[in-house]
Amino acid sequence: MDCVLRSYLLLAFGFLICLFLFCLVVFIWFVYKQILFRTTAQSNEARHNHSTVV
């Protein structure tokens, strides 16, 4: 019984680790997309301001 319980705990622990890694990857991808979008928006805005000044 102890061996079965240990295998179940190991399976649950592995599932939690996979879930945590998946959430981490999604969070990093979301933050990277936000930063990328913000930098492109700033560059477009700077280019627009530069064209209006000239």
Swiss-Prot record:
It holds the Pfam family MP_p6. Changing R6A: Strong reduction of virus ability to move from cell to cell. The keyword NAD does not apply. It is found in: Host rough endoplasmic reticulum membrane. It is a single-pass type III membrane protein. It comes from Beet yellows virus (isolate Ukraine). Residues 32-54 are cytoplasmic. Transports viral genome to neighboring plant cells directly through plasmosdesmata, without any budding. The movement protein allows efficient cell to cell propagation, by bypassing the host cell wall barrier. Two movement proteins, p6, Hsp70h and three structural proteins, CP, CPm, and P64 are essential for cell-cell movement. Also plays a role in virion formation. Together with CPm and p64, encapsidates the 5'-terminal portion of the viral genome. It comes from the Viruses. Changing H50A: Reduces virus ability to move from cell to cell. This is Movement protein p6. Keywords: Disulfide bond, Host endoplasmic reticulum, Host membrane, Membrane, Transmembrane, Transmembrane helix, Transport, Viral movement protein. GO terms for cellular component: host cell rough endoplasmic reticulum membrane; membrane. Its main location: host cell. The keyword Transmembrane helix applies. The chain crosses the membrane at residues 11-31. Homodimer; disulfide-linked. One of its GO terms (biological process) is transport of virus in host, cell to cell. Residues 1-10 are lumenal.
